[in-house]
Amino acid sequence: MISQLNLKNLKFSAALAPKSVSRFCATLVVCLVATGFGTANADIIADRKAGFKGNADSMKAIAAAITSGDYQTVINRAEGIASWANTIPSYFPEGSDSGDTKARAEIWFEFDAFKAKAKANETAALTLVTAAKSGDQGAMMAGLKNLGANCKSCHSNFKD
């Protein structure tokens, strides 16, 4: 990082022409910027993978909680899924389509459709919250099935 460089001890030879210094500086800037973006790209991909893993874990926990009658867990986990769904598009900034990812390029070519899928997932999760608050186990199972269908729909279009 630039903040770690000790520029006071950096000495340039008088033999270095201004053009050479300019080229060096330009190369240094390009390398620093490229490294920073590479790191940011890897971080956002890791973060979104963690979010989707948490989502999958919540789906399993919800299924078990419905069966056991633990409706508060259903509410908490479904609210978490809704919150995650609301933020999903922000985890797919331009340039995060390469690296260790299964995201298809269609996400960025059809970003409005991708955002609509995330919104539908949020709505399905909130519908499940409402069902859990009512205590209607049948409505919860239907809500979980609908939520799963929303997840699958997005995967079909946007994930390899």
PLM features: residue spans?
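Extracytoplasmic c-type cytochrome modules immediately beyond a signal peptide or single-pass transmembrane anchor
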Residues: 41-146
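Processing junctions and N-termini across compartments
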Residues: 36, 145-148
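C-terminal segment of classical bacterial N-terminal signal peptides
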Residues: 23-27, 32-40
